[in-house]
């Protein structure tokens, strides 16, 4: 009891190491490419870097410059370290998450000690999730426009879903377990 979060974080660890992450989705619909300021001791260390009008910033791989993360035509990077106009360093938020969860402390062996689920089974379940999400994707040839005004020629569905009910949230660390489940999705 109470070790569900460790199990879920181990799945995330395995998927990151297997490079089974839907980066296109993360770039399109999340703050994964938004730059996070890395300036130890500064008031805004750990906050999103923003432009003059409050827009979130990213590193555009096309222009090799800092850009508004919301603009159509921008190709945001999700990993790397970049220099802001004021000379400070920033990294995409996905980079911070990947750095944390790729650590061996979140691996299958570490989770097996806390959960009672073998490392072999954790890896197998992660592989099954990856297979369902990437090898059995559903593609609909339907044109649509996303939230940023970018035209899409197809819709991709990944047949993996989870729903956290009261059981998880009833535990003292339930909020963090639910958060981990949503990161996994």
Residue spans of the language-model regions?
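A glycine-rich, hydrophobic/aromatic-adjacent loop/helix-cap motif
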Residues: 103, 109, 125-185
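Long, well-ordered, tryptophan-enriched scaffold segments
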Residues: 1-144
């Amino acid at each position: 009891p109470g070790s569900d979060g460790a199990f879920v974080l181990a799945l995330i660890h395995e998927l990151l190491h297997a490079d089974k992450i839907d980066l296109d989705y993360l770039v399109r619909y999340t703050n994964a490419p938004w730059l996070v300021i890395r300036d130890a001791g500064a008031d805004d260390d750990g906050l999103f870097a923003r432009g003059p009008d409050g827009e979130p910033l990213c590193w555009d791989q096309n222009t090799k410059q800092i850009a508004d993360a919301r603009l159509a035509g921008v190709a945001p990077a999700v990993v790397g370290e970049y220099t802001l106009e004021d000379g400070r360093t920033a990294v995409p938020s996905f980079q911070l998450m990947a750095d944390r969860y790729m650590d061996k402390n979140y691996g299958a062996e570490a989770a097996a000690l806390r959960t009672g689920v073998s490392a072999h089974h954790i890896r197998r379940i992660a592989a099954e999730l990856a297979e369902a999400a990437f090898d059995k994707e559903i593609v609909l040839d339907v044109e649509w426009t996303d939230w940023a005004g970018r035209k899409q020629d197809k819709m991709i569905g990944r047949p993996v879903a989870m729903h956290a009910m009261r059981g998880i949230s009833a535990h003292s660390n339930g909020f963090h377990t639910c958060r981990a489940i949503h990161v996994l999705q």
